[in-house]
From Swiss-Prot:
Renumbered residue ranges of the record's region Cytidylyltransferase: 343-474
Pfam family of the protein (one): PfkB
Keyword terms: ATP-binding, Carbohydrate metabolism, Kinase, Lipopolysaccharide biosynthesis, Multifunctional enzyme, Nucleotide-binding, Nucleotidyltransferase, Transferase
Protein name: Bifunctional protein HldE
Family recorded in the similarity comment: In the N-terminal section; belongs to the carbohydrate kinase PfkB family. In the C-terminal section; belongs to the cytidylyltransferase family.
Gene Ontology MF annotations: ATP binding; heptose 7-phosphate kinase activity; heptose-1-phosphate adenylyltransferase activity; phosphotransferase activity, alcohol group as acceptor
Positions of the catalytic residues: 263
Biological classification of the source: Bacteria, Pseudomonadati, Pseudomonadota, Gammaproteobacteria, Pseudomonadales
InterPro entries reported for this sequence: Bifunc_HldE (IPR023030), Carboh/pur_kinase_PfkB_CS (IPR002173), Cyt_trans-like (IPR004821), PfkB_dom (IPR011611), RfaE_dom_I (IPR011913), RfaE_dom_II (IPR011914), Ribokinase-like (IPR029056), Rossmann-like_a/b/a_fold (IPR014729)
Family annotation (PANTHER family): BIFUNCTIONAL PROTEIN HLDE (PTHR46969:SF1)
Gene3D superfamilies linked to this entry: 3.40.1190.20, HUPs (3.40.50.620)
Region (Ribokinase): 1-318
Amino acid sequence: MKLSMPRFDQAPVLVVGDVMLDRYWHGATSRISPEAPVPVVRVEQHEDRPGGAANVALNIAALGAQALLVGVTGRDEAADSLANSLKAAGVDARFQRIDSQPTIVKLRVMSRHQQLLRVDFEEPFRTDAAALAVDVESLLAKVKVLVLSDYGKGALQNHQVLIQAARARNIPVLADPKGKDFAIYRGASLITPNLSEFETIVGRCADEAELVAKGQALMSELDLGALLVTRGEHGMTLLRHGQPALHLPARAREVFDVTGAGDTVISTLAAALAAGEELPSAVGLANLAAGIVVGKLGTAAISAPELRRAVQREQGSERGVLGLEQLLLAIEDARAHGEKIVFTNGCFDILHAGHVTYLEQARAQGDRLIVGVNDDASVTRLKGVGRPINSVDRRMAVLAGLGAVDWVVSFAEDTPERLLEQVRPDVLVKGGDYGVEQVVGAQIVKAYGGEVRVLGLVENSSTTAIVEKIRQKG
């Protein structure tokens, strides 16, 4: 799937649901309490982060989209902390404050990046559902997507009023469901249960085929536009009417904490759809975003630059013609898997059998082969007027089609030295009958511990000779 970064700055989203404050106490523990067999934590640092629906809104704002939030809090210090954090992040938050009940707070005691204890301060809210619906309806004209972030804490009392109000305005409704009754989300454009939540409703799924069949039945029963089941290390499965199931593998490199991963999924989906992305592409972006956020500790948001890097890395993992930034990310990924990077360069104006043999030999020097290609202006400077015969785009396209070549990148200078300083290959390869020290860029590569190898040329294979022969016949 080809992914690209949406214009999130043109993506207003309204989030309605259960807001809460995630509070963290970080400290050191080196002894057991004499009062009970529990560790003693000496608190050194504390921090507050928006949680629940507030984290969804925070994630949307972090991507550069406009986030509006409607929720319910107490009238207390925790609500003030939540409001201040959201305001600083650019979230337009509208809270229904209740005097008689506290803001929901999840306190986590941490030591050495490990969670030792969680303490919940909460009571189910007795929400003024009618007033909340009025607030939501007054904001729908300003947004392109409505998100229902339901944690079952009482902020959402009448889901159907909100869903129907949005549908009447042709605004997609995304719901992150909770509980044992998904009928309350009837008519939603998309719901995003995790596998456990999904199986609570439909029963255990023995395999993907059963998951798909039960998911399609649920969609029909509840008049859902689509269903996205998040499946942890097994990725995500998107179901749509009349379309084959789309299974996306998990993209996490390392998993430190899954807290808030569901919030990240629905927030990225909402922002991408509001920015005009088609649903499969939005799901692909959400899958990448989830892979990033589980690598962070605690409730966290991802930024637009982080997602952009992930998109570029995803495209860079494919073989073919890449820009420099994509190439560097692809190299980073390859090295993370212990792969040896080989680099060679040239004009490759008219690709011939000698080139093919040489590139196959170059590829055999390592695991990944990068081919640097002189752009048109540098070929003209090196080869003279009338060259290149083929434009740089055509030359790179032909090279990218060879099985021996992983990545192709162009450079504007006459030599690849500047490119070598950025790419830093493990092996620099050149074809010819000269010594290693005569290879352009050899000193750069050897300075950081890389290798330089010279391969023999295939006899009777010369682009210049081929060009001259064509001209004589013409």
